[in-house]
Each structure stands twice: as C-alpha cells, then as structure tokens.
Amino acid sequence: RRVLFRSLQMLDTKLIRKAYRERICNIEQTISTFIVYIKYKKNKVPYMNSNFFKYRDTSVWNCEFYDEKNWPKSYFYMHQCYEKNQKFAEGGILLTYMNYADVVKWNGTKIGKRGSDYEDFKCAKAEQLLSVLEQDMPGTLNNIEGYWTSTPLTYQDYTATKHGSMYGIARDVNDPINTFVSPRTKLPNLFLVGQNTNSH
C-alpha cells in the first residue's frame, strides 16, 4: 500500500480522483510478523526435513488476535541446511504473528538507530518465542550460537509495505468494492501490480 500511495502521489493528474486516492490510502492492512533467525552450534541439532507449525490453543483460527499474556498463540519453525548430506541444521527460522501496534512507538526511526529500548524489546520477544520453542523441541536453546530478529518495522522499511503487512490489504467480504484495487487505472497504459491487486 505504501508503494501504491507513493505512486499515486507522483501522479499529478485530475484523472486520479481524490476520493480514489483516499480510499486506497485508508484500506486497513493485514497482520505483520516477528521472526527469529537462529544460528546453531555445528553438528548439534539434527536436521528436520519438514516445517513445524504449532498452535498453542485448540483452534488454528484467530492466532493474530493476542495480548501480552498469550503471545505467541502460534508459530512456524523450519531448519536450514546447505549441505548435500542434511544431517545437522545450520540454522532455523522461527516466525509468529506480530501487530504493528507492538512497535508503533518506534515509528519514524531509522534502521540501526531505533535505540536500546527497541533492542531490549526485540530481545525480550525473541527469548519469549524461543522459550515456547524449547517446550516443543527440548534442548534447542543450549545449541544456539546466536540469533537475529526482525519486526514489523523491519518489513515496513525493507519492503515499503505499510505497517510491514504480510498479506497486503485486509479484504472485506461484506464490502468487497471498498477493498478492491483494480489493476487498471484511469491513466492510459498505467497498470497496477502486486499483492494488493492479486496480479503479480
């Protein structure tokens, strides 16, 4: 949406109406993500040649609706191994939902210059997520050499997607016209593509 909004700003034409610009710029975004990128100690963690999905509740639905006490409600975990003989994992990726509201206090800050409180926040969330992983994969924590994290701000900065949205705009089945973005525009030969138009 951010890219689309910037594109609309660059178009100085009356063919793109103000109402259209405002509608596009005010469509709600979907959830973002928090990821821990893990580096394992050499030859310590047996390679898992499949993905692992965990739902901490009895339902797979509404995992994006959480609070401080029940986060994360679900997570995705996978191993990385770059050798032909995939005996041990070299790294892992641990991913869960995160709302932009969790990091909004650092909105407008630059990459690498968000301050120590942001680093503390990421560390606390990583440790919380890793402790949940440890419950399902005992012994994992002792074999971690290091880890790095990314938040909704990371995705907002690197993908230019408003709020680091994973799935683009939030579609509304009850009001499909208001959340529809047509690839065709009023300008001749200008077409929109990307996840918000479902036209890649």
Write out the residue ranges for each language-model feature:
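Generic beta-strand/beta-sheet core signal
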Residues: 1-2, 95-97, 193
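Glycine- and acidic
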Residues: 33-34, 107-118, 191-197
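Short glycine/proline-enriched loop/turn "hinge" motifs that connect secondary-structure elements
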Residues: 83-89, 180-185
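A glycine-rich dinucleotide-binding beta-alpha-beta segment and adjacent secondary-structure elements
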Residues: 134-198
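Mid-domain catalytic core of redox enzymes
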Residues: 2-87
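Short, flexible loop/turn elements at secondary-structure junctions
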Residues: 40-42, 98, 194-197
